[in-house]
Amino acid sequence: METTNKIRAGDVRTASRLIRDLEDRIPGARRKLKDLFVHTGKSFIIGITGSPGAGKSTLADALVHEFRRRSKTVGVLAVDPTSPFTGGAILGDRIRMLRHAEDEGVFVRSLATRGALGGLSQVAGDAIHVMEAMGKDVIIVETVGIGQQELDIVNHAHSVIVVLVPGMGDDIQAMKAGVMEIADVFAVNKADRPGAGQLQTELATLLGTTAIPEGGWIPPVVSLGNLYEPAGFAQQASELAQKVMEHYNHLIVSGRLSGRLERKAMMEITEALRSSILEPVLSRLMSTGELKVMTGRVANRETDPYSEAEAVASRFLKVEGAT
């Protein structure tokens, strides 16, 4: 309970240590998270996704500044599924977050899979819960790309911002089946660049030809211009924060927030099952060398992956109703 009390009091060192232990699958970390869970569920969670180089870190930083201006405490979870957070060019833009380093109302944490078994989504969900238990009013989850893992991660959010930049018009069509469907707010970043008007037109056309989703929310489009014009950029960031808050209020008033919470709970249960069942089985098969043998048999077409999986399941899982 000491860990719980410290985290609830906002102790950054304790929170960082627990997130690291959860990320590294340290024994005992899961029990501490269980104790914290009853103190979660009160934060507003925002997901930010978009192509690499779209300026997501810049927008996340601007939103942190805006929410702090509104006297909200903020947690930021920067997710990198490709490299350990010991440095690297991909983290360059996140250096901007250092301006909040001395602000006790802001807690910034980065995550990486480091090759661990299981989905990155669960690790992100665990970190979100730690930040919730710290009492953060707003939690911003920033992903690096727009792959399936990133889409899974933003499903932990109440509201999702999809960041677009001029020059990626062709990508809008490609993203239809994935990212476009999860957007609650569109942010056209670097809107002072050539092609911004075309991008906004294509986006408006896409939204105009898309059926109004159940619940009646049509994603608004917020344009953000030159970072080096602080006053204008700050005003645009304020508008972005306002639109996201309006979406959250819409979820509450329309009664659709419960659906998002159930979706989030379903994902967490699925990830927890994967962690509790699949990971131990895979670890056992790897340590005994069985997985390598199975892989060889399937690769040589001596058997199929479905039969191998069924055989493993029959060994490790107790079938309901079996005697």
Where in the sequence are the language-model features?
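Long, well-ordered amphipathic alpha-helical subdomains in the mid-to-C-terminal portions
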Residues: 15, 223-225, 239-317
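Nucleotide-state-sensitive switch-loop elements of NTP-binding domains
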Residues: 2-46, 51-54, 63-149, 156-171
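Alpha-helical scaffold elements adjacent to nucleotide-binding pockets in ATP/GTP-utilizing enzyme cores
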Residues: 90, 127, 152, 156, ...
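Canonical P-loop GTPase G-domain recognition
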Residues: 185, 191-251
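Conserved beta-strand segments of the P-loop GTPase G domain that flank and frequently precede/overlap
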Residues: 110-111, 162-165, 187-190, 223-225
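Hydrophobic positions on the alpha1 helix immediately C-terminal to the Walker A/P-loop
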Residues: 59
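Signal for well-folded cores of large energy- and translation-related assemblies
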Residues: 23, 37, 41, 64-68, ...
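Flexible active-site lid/hinge loop adjacent to a nucleotide/diphosphate
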Residues: 153, 166-194
